[in-house]
Amino acid sequence: MVGHAIHGMIALGGRSRRGSRVTPTPDSTLADAQQTIADLRRELAESEPQKAAMAEVLGVINSSPGELSPVFDAILEKAHTLCGASHGVLATYDGEHFRAVATHELPTPFAELLRRPFPPEPGGPQEQLLRGERLFHAPGASVLTGPGGDTPRTRAAREAGQRAFLMLPLRKDGRLLGYITANRNEPGPLSDKQIALLENFAAQATLFE
């Protein structure tokens, strides 16, 4: 055996090791297949509510030709349901002012305040979106005070019980058309999957601008 390579052993002289190949056992192959099937079933189950929500939005579009208000209402409501958001708005931007065109589960005074045109607050979330930020995510209570101090909108948010805040832009061809928010009454971040869902609905909203 001296002078001959021995498979499965470490070669002398610092050469690389050659080992026997491990052949998957029937049990491991079956377990992998079962895990793959389980993953596919879970993904399918998770996608079904989104498909159903999109179908309902399409139904609203078909039943309200030329009317954008019910379409925006439907997009916002379905997005919040899937993301587990308590309340929020869908707002448009005319180049100078923002204005909510749909609100969901907001106290009436707060909703009316956001429906009035307002400029972006210096350093605020809307201004950050104008600078090109992908999103503004404030999972804690610090969102209740803006960088410029209290404003009528931040006070109304506090009175509405808002404790977590996510704002996503509505963009088309690089131009900011507005934003959509998903807010919660308990502190804590939205997951990447929930943010991705909201981005999908934001993309749908830009089709009607």
Residue ranges and their predicted role:
Residues 76-80, 88-122, 131-135:
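GAF sensory/regulatory domain recognition
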Residues 199-206:
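Allosteric cytosolic regulatory segments
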Residues 109-148, 155-158, 166:
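Regulatory sensory and allosteric helical modules in signal-transduction proteins
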Residues 170-180:
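Short hydrophobic/glycine-rich mini-motifs in sensory/regulatory modules
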Residues 21-70, 81, 193:
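Signal-transmission linkers at sensory-effector interfaces
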Residues 163-171:
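A short, aliphatic-rich beta-strand micro-motif
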Residues 106, 179-188:
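Short beta-strand-to-loop transition segments that serve as allosteric relay/switch motifs
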Residues 49, 58-66, 75-84, 89-92, ...:
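Short regulatory alpha-helical segment in sensory/regulatory domains of signaling proteins that mediates
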